[in-house]
Structures are given as C-alpha cells and as structure tokens.
Regions:
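The feature captures the beta-strand-to-loop junction immediately N-terminal to the Walker
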Residues: 32-37
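Helix-to-loop junction immediately C-terminal to a conserved catalytic motif
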Residues: 50
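Conserved ABC transporter NBD signature motif
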Residues: 58-69
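ABC-family P-loop ATPase nucleotide-binding domains
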Residues: 72-75, 81-142
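Catalytic Walker B motif of ABC-type/P-loop ATPase nucleotide-binding domains
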Residues: 154-158
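ABC transporter nucleotide-binding domain
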Residues: 171-187, 191-257
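Conserved small/polar residues in nucleotide/adenosyl-binding loops
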Residues: 266-273
Length: 277
C-alpha cells in the first residue's frame, strides 16, 4: 500500500546544510516517532513533507503523486506545529473559536464534534485569544487541530512539549485510538526517545543530516540502553558504542546507545549526586 515517500531530499539555509540526501518511506496506518536532538532538522523535514518548505533537491510523493503544489495530495496531510506569532492558519490574535473555524475550512475531513469535545475535555476557553493561551493550552490546541483534521497522514511537531504528564498520557491514548479505529498515519517528532516505548510502532532517528536509522520500536529498544550523568563519565562509559541520540539536560548529559557486544554501560552519578558526596 502506498504512503508518503521522500526521495533524496536535501536542504540548506545559506551555507548550513540541514538535510543531505534523505530518503524515507512512511507506510499508511502506522504511528512513527521522528527522533533527534533539537536543531537536527526534524521540523525542516516535516515542513518539506507537507509542501510548506521547498527542498533544494529531491521529491515528496503521496500515493505516487507529487506533494508540492498539489492541492489534492496536500488535502490528505495535516502538519500541526507550535503556534507562533504568524501561523499557517493566520494571526494568533484571533479567538480560539475563530482559529478552529479556519481550521475546519482548511481540512476537508474536519470533525467538528471531535474538536468541540476535546476543547471541553481540556478546558480551553474558546472566547480567549490564541496569543493569551498558556504554553500547555497552545500545545493542546495544536493537538486538537491535528486530531480533528482527520487527515490520513497527520504530522505533529513536538506536540507533548508543553503538556503535563497526565495530559500527555491522554494525548497519546487519543493518538493510538485514532490509529486503531480509523487507520490514520501519525508522524510525531520528539527529542525524548523514552516516549517511543508505548506509542510508536516505528522509530526514525535523524542524525548528521540524514536518516540514521529506521526500525521497529520493540526491536530497537531491545538493543538500546539509556545512559546519563556527568558528561565526562558518560562519554567514558559509552566509548566505542553506537550513539543514536544525545542531549544535554541542565548539567547532565544523556545518551541512548546501541548495545554492541561487550560494551560496558552504566549510569554515572548526576551532578547533584556528585555535589552531595
């Protein structure tokens, strides 16, 4: 069954190459996690996939049809991202009610009842201006648009970033329900690989301007270990291991590595633990 396909996508901003010859096939009816550190090119790739940002070279197709400048193909794809001063749907000084109305025009399969139910469930005041919403409410509004769009392929950029733990769990349950009941495809970007365990069927990791790996989540996590602590200690611990993701969290350094042979892995003390000793 056809889906969304990227072929040899490259993109640079002035002299900074962000994506280099990226090829990727997204099958229909799956939940994908797009993982990589901040600044690795996740948002750039997603915006190219949805025709919002032209690539320097390569092509994107949906069911064999070009996505760029193709309204029919794009009508099956929703890219819902953090709302900025000026967003896809207009100025964010509009009230939530008007913002949702504009979304209903843009997405042909818009589910008004779902949007209304989710707005009530998450306590969003429709009379409030979008620009006056908290970060958590902005994230939830982004999620609502993605879900209520009913697009066959729905792409969400760091949707859980502003959500607390309870709401985040409810969000992921909604995603899983939509995929199981309606066969929708979701691509969800995050820099937190631990979120993959119970949600994503496949994980795509961007690193060094390209797709570093694409693998079944269960199989990948069986091979991986998460190591965190003082940067020097962590680097010594994983020396010689295949690092698939890394991030700095305050003064701590965390990496996800592939278990490889006799590579010794351990979690070193955090800076706070070190200060206490």
């Amino acid at each position: 069954m056809s889906g969304l396909e990227c072929k040899n996508i490259s993109k640079s901003y002035k002299d900074n190459k962000v994506l280099d010859n990226v090829s990727l096939n997204i099958e229909q009816g799956k939940i994908y996690g797009l993982i990589g550190r901040n600044g690795v090119g996740k948002t750039t790739l997603m915006s190219i996939m949805t025709g919002q940002n032209p690539a320097d070279s390569g092509e994107v197709t949906y069911n064999g049809q070009p996505v760029w400048e193709n309204a029919e193909a794009l009508s099956h794809i929703c890219f819902s991202r953090e709302i900025n001063t000026k967003s896809l749907l207009g100025m964010n000084n509009q009230k939530v009610k008007e913002y949702l109305r504009l979304a209903s025009i843009y997405y042909k399969n818009w589910d008004k009842d779902m949007a209304e139910e989710l707005v009530k469930r998450f306590g969003i005041d429709k009379k409030k201006k979008v620009c006056n919403l908290s970060k958590g409410m902005l994230s939830m509004l982004t999620v609502i648009i993605g879900l209520a769009s009913k697009a066959e392929i729905t792409i969400l950029d760091e949707p859980a970033a502003g959500l607390d733990v309870i709401v985040r769990e409810e969000f992921y349950k909604l995603i899983i329900d939509e995929q199981q009941e309606n066969g929708r495809t979701f691509i969800i970007s995050t820099h937190i690989i631990e979120e993959a365990a119970n949600v994503f069927e496949e994980v795509i990791i961007l690193k060094d301007k390209c797709v570093y790996l694409k693998e079944n989540t269960v199989e990948l996590l069986d091979k991986c270990r998460y190591v965190s602590g003082l940067e020097e200690n962590v680097k010594n611990a994983v020396d010689g291991c295949k690092i698939i993701n890394e991030e700095h969290i305050g003064r701590s350094y965390a990496v996800t590595v592939m278990q490889d042979g006799d590579c010794l892995l351990y979690t070193s003390p955090s800076p706070r633990d070190t200060e206490r000793s």
